[in-house]
Amino acid sequence: MGKSIRTREYQGFAHKLKKARLETGLTQVQVSKKLKRPQSYISKVEAGEQRLDIIELKNFAELYKKDFHYFIK
């Protein structure tokens, strides 16, 4: 069985992603179109059910106009 990604630390990271999206005024659908991903992917990322790699995080940071470090503090 795989290790759960639902740690408190990862949930905090996922919460920051959602908060950043809301601060930009974008919907999950709008983000999904800009990142060329399904809306369900954005939902899973924000729920902490889908991990991101470093390049994906960079793409979110650029879209949300946030410094990369905002998400990993």
Residues covered by each model-derived region:
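DNA major-groove recognition helix of helix-turn-helix/homeodomain DNA-binding modules
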Residues: 55-70
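Short alpha-helical DNA-recognition segment
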Residues: 25-44
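A short, Lys/Arg-rich alpha-helix, primarily the initiator
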Residues: 2-23
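Alpha-helical residues within the helix-turn-helix
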Residues: 22, 33, 62
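Anionic, Ser/Thr-rich low-complexity intrinsically disordered regions
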Residues: 13, 44-47
